[in-house]
A protein has these predicted regions:
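Accessory C-terminal segments flanking Radical SAM cores
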Residues: 2-131, 149-152
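Leucine-rich repeat
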Residues: 171-175
Length: 183
């Protein structure tokens, strides 16, 4: 496999899959807070219709070198554009992209990322950056947010009876307790 470093023109490479992990209040794991992985990438992804609605959280060790993460790293080293990284690729936030942030923050680790990652995408690098959101406690109700990340939006959903435990099972008591216990 021909690995292409950013210094060789790779514009899609990001250090997040080598250094960072994100965990949502529902214990879903992602590349970062802005990544757009499809639901089928996650065994514990419980907020879509494409699941068994069973709570199966994934530990960091299970997640770090799973098939999805290895595929992401492999494709990034090849310079491929990833649909998971649409927010950065298309500058959807109208600001500096997270990729630039990660690559600047960990620029001294780029060579290590390439050296420690085999052709399958498996890496021996360890996570050093954690964005763990243990609950959705937030008193804001920003328009772009929702009940997954804002307790204010969750309260409004409950008050207006607009939530459905089939589609938002994390709001139901038994599952809510399991999530708290996992964290």
């Amino acid at each position: 496999m021909k690995k292409i470093k950013p210094s060789q023109g790779n514009k899609t490479f990001c250090m997040a899959p080598w250094t960072h992990t994100y965990l949502s209040p529902q214990t879903e794991r992602r590349l970062c807070c802005a990544s757009r992985e499809p639901a089928q990438s996650f065994k514990q992804y419980i907020d879509t219709g494409n699941n068994s609605k069973k709570y199966k959280p994934q530990s960091l060790d299970e997640h770090w070198n799973n098939d999805h993460m290895r595929s992401v790293r492999r494709r990034m080293m090849l310079g491929e554009k990833l649909k998971e990284c649409q927010v950065c690729d298309e500058k959807l936030l109208n600001t500096n992209v997270y990729r630039s942030y990660w690559n600047q923050l960990f620029k001294n680790k780029i060579d290590e990322a390439f050296a420690s990652t085999d052709d399958s995408g498996y890496t021996t690098m360890k996570t050093i950056s954690f964005d763990y959101r243990f609950n959705n406690l937030c008193n804001f109700k920003c328009r772009m947010c929702g009940d997954m990340l804002s307790s204010s939006w969750e309260s409004e959903s409950r008050k207006n009876k607009t939530w459905n435990k089939d589609y938002q099972p994390w709001m139901a008591s038994p599952l809510r307790e399991e999530i708290k216990n996992f964290q």
